[in-house]
From Swiss-Prot:
Family annotation (Pfam families): AdoMet_dc
One GO CC term, this protein: cytosol
Species classification: Bacteria, Bacillati, Bacillota, Clostridia, Thermoanaerobacterales
A single GO BP: spermidine biosynthetic process
InterPro entries: AdoMetDC_C (IPR042286), AdoMetDC_fam_prok (IPR003826), AdoMetDC_N (IPR042284), S-AdoMet_deCO2ase_core (IPR016067), S-AdoMet_deCOase_pro-enz (IPR017716)
Cofactor (UniProt): pyruvate
Protein's name according to its UniProt entry: S-adenosylmethionine decarboxylase proenzyme
Function recorded in the entry: Catalyzes the decarboxylation of S-adenosylmethionine to S-adenosylmethioninamine (dcAdoMet), the propylamine donor required for the synthesis of the polyamines spermine and spermidine from the diamine putrescine.
A molecular function GO annotation: adenosylmethionine decarboxylase activity
Organism name: Caldanaerobacter subterraneus subsp. tengcongensis (strain DSM 15242 / JCM 11007 / NBRC 100824 / MB4) (Thermoanaerobacter tengcongensis)
Record-linked SUPFAM superfamilies: S-adenosylmethionine decarboxylase
């Protein structure tokens, strides 16, 4: 692999607003998404905003997953960044969109830490 990692930036639309505003459901979805990628979960931090919305991060050995929700718009901004080639960030992004009952998603993959020669990092 010539890149240290893959970072998926997803725009998730038409989601179930009740799910987007439920901090416990969002946390569970994000942790399960990390597991779906094959990652090792290290820590989680989630916050419920007033009057609505949730933001959170799942720190994984391979990097992180984040989400920021706007229930009033049925929208979530999702990032899944994984390092190494034993995990697949697309598995996590697709799982999240499915669990949010999204009608539409656009996503972009960014290669992170791109080097001219293949790189090998300890623990990956």
């Amino acid at each position: 692999m010539n890149a240290l990692g893959r970072h998926i930036l997803a725009e998730v639309y038409g989601c179930d607003s009740r799910i987007l505003d439920d901090v416990e459901m969002i946390e569970d979805i994000m942790v399960q998404a990390a597991i779906a990628t094959g990652a090792e979960v290290r820590e989680v931090a989630f916050h419920k905003f007033n009057p609505q919305g949730v933001s959170g991060v799942v720190v994984i050995s391979e990097s992180h997953l984040t989400i920021h929700t706007w229930p009033e718009l049925g929208y979530a901004a999702v990032d899944v960044f994984t390092c190494g080639d034993h995990v697949n960030p697309w598995d996590g992004v697709n799982y999240i969109a499915r669990m949010l009952k999204a009608e539409n998603m656009t996503a972009t993959e960014v290669k992170r830490g791109v080097f001219e020669k293949p790189v090998k990092v300890a623990n990956f």
